[in-house]
């Protein structure tokens, strides 16, 4: 049970680090390339999730998520004993990350109450107003919101943390890795 739990956690952390969303936000304010391909309709090198979400240039938003995921996976030592067809099975409980807890820990930098993790999965409006700019008014030093629409661009929601957590839970239950879309 401990080996499967550790293997599942290792796979979850590997999937988190390999995610284009994680990598793009982790790249910080210096990166202006949208390699997660969530920002549809903006040119290559004209912005990234880090700038569009509006993180401060000194923020490291992934660190808190990374710490939470690393702290998860506690195995409860007392198993449930199941007897079936002359066999005895032991079922262990493992604490998995809670997406709602992650959402509570990740508020949008400019909009209290809404989570940027949830926004990545559900959608973020205003991409057509996003202007790549090195303006001192920009928190990220990457871009600002223009007063008028600049282009027909849309944010493409993507299953992110929920897919990673669901794959982790499935691995714990079945012992089989899930393929995540990149």
Regions found by a protein language model. Give the residues of each.
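Short, Lys/Arg-rich flexible segments
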Residues: 1-182
């Amino acid at each position: 049970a401990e080996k499967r739990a550790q293997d599942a956690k290792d796979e979850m952390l590997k999937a988190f680090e390999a995610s284009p969303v994680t990598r793009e936000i982790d790249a910080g304010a210096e990166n202006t390339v949208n390699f997660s391909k969530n920002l549809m309709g903006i040119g290559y090198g004209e912005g990234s999730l880090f700038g569009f979400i509006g993180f401060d240039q000194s923020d490291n938003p992934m660190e808190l998520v990374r710490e939470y995921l690393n702290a998860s996976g506690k195995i409860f030592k007392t198993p449930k004993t199941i007897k079936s067809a002359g066999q005895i099975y032991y079922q262990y409980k493992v604490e998995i990350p809670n997406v709602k807890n992650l959402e509570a820990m990740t508020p949008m930098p400019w909009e209290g109450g809404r989570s940027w993790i949830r926004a990545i999965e559900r959608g973020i409006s205003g991409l057509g107003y996003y202007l790549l700019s090195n303006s001192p008014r920009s928190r990220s030093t990457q871009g600002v919101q223009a007063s008028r629409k600049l282009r027909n661009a849309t944010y493409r929601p993507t299953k992110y943390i929920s897919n990673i957590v669901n794959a982790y839970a499935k691995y714990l239950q079945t012992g089989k890795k899930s393929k995540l879309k990149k």
